[in-house]
Amino acid sequence: MGEPSKEEYKIQCFDAETQQLLKTALKDPGAVDLEKVANVIVDHSLQDSVFSKEAGRMCYAIIQAESKQAGQSVFRRGLLNRLQQEYQTREQLRARSLQGWVCYVTFICNIFDYLRVNNMPMMALVNPVYDCLFRLAQPDSLSKEEEVDCLVLQLHRVGEQLEKMNGQRMDELFVLIRDGFLLPAGLSSLAQLLLLEIIEFRAAGWKTTPAAHKYYYSEVSD
């Protein structure tokens, strides 16, 4: 599998100077301030929902390049520190900007999906990711379609990996999701459909059956 071209990392959304910084970080990480690079990537991920879905791949590539070049992990440390800072103020972020909060959850799940230690997901990210998903499964979040959409998308992406790391918390999360599905009011029909789909997706071993795919995707397109 060849390395993706730099353009595939969707860095065109940055100004020319930042694009150059990111390109250098990918090719010659020792030549740039990698903590600054980590902050640039996190800042942009909180504002750009498309980039937040892509950034994990770029972060993984920079970590690999730095490890190969210098055997160090300055970038990874900077990235995890910044993720932790945002995690600690996540309620304030959600209150300030729902889009920023949804982007943060997308980003941390993306990082969890891509970053590996000895071929395993990073234990340090398991509980923060779960905490974010638990927050999305609270009644006040389930009344907002953007948050339901985010919850379901992230469970499609990392649910199976998360369950392997901590099955008990996944059971608890799905109790909340099932309770939310039965909320008497405040849930849109699309939100109900999405929650039912993810409940069935997990019950089928994190797979979509052909019948379910046909049913849900015809409903959503209608």
From Swiss-Prot:
Domain of life: Eukaryota
Protein's UniProt keywords contain Cytoplasm: yes
Database matches in SUPFAM superfamilies: ARM repeat
Molecular function as annotated in GO: RNA binding; translation activator activity
GO biological process: regulation of translational initiation
Protein family: Belongs to the MIF4GD family.
Subunit structure: Interacts with EIF4G1, EIF4G2 and SLBP; probably tethered by SLBP to the 3'-end of mRNAs ending with the histone stem-loop, it also interacts with EIF4G1 which is bound to their 5'-end.
Record function comment: Functions in replication-dependent translation of histone mRNAs which differ from other eukaryotic mRNAs in that they do not end with a poly-A tail but a stem-loop. May participate in circularizing those mRNAs specifically enhancing their translation.
Protein name: MIF4G domain-containing protein
Lineage of source species: Eukaryota, Metazoa, Chordata, Craniata, Vertebrata
